[in-house]
Amino acid sequence: MGQLTVEAAAGRRGLREFVDHPYRKYRGDPVWVPPLRVSQLDLLDEGKNPLWRHARRTLYLARRDGRVVGRVAYIEDDEHMRVHDERIAFFGFFEADDEQVAGALLDVVEAHARSAGMLAVRGPINGTMN
C-alpha cells in the first residue's frame, strides 16, 4: 500500500472531489442508492445551506498515492455551542472502509477540535440543522 495523506479540500475542485468520492467508491454496487449530487453540493454550499450562517466547516480528503480513499467534514456550530453551553465540534460526511484511512481522518478531526479549544467531538452528522 502507498503513502496515506490527509489534507483539507481546497476550492471548487476540492469540494467536487469531496462530493464525488462516494459516487466513485460505490459505483457498480447494486444496493447503493446515490443521493442527487446537486443536493449534496447544496448541503455543503455556504450560500445555500442555512446551517452555515452559524457554523463553519473544513472538508478533509484522505489520499493514497494521489487517489481519494476517504473523506470527513469537521464542523463547528456556534449556535449549538451557545444553546447547549458546550464546546464541542462535530464530524460528518464520513467515508472510509479501511481502518488506517478511518483512523487518519478521525485523528485530523480530533486535532482540529483540540486546536480550536473544543472539549469533545460528536458525530456523524449530515450537514443539516436537525
Kindly label every feature range from the protein language model.
Residues G2, A55-T58, G70:
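Short beta-strand or tight-loop elements
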Residues K48, I75-E79:
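Alpha-helical subdomain
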Residues L61, R67-E76:
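Conserved beta-strand in the GNAT
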Residues M1-G47, F90:
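Short amphipathic alpha-helix that is part of the acyltransferase structural core
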Residues D45-R64:
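A short helix-loop-beta-strand connector motif used in the catalytic cores of GNAT acetyltransferases and
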Residues R82-N130:
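Acyl-donor binding region in acyl/amide transferases
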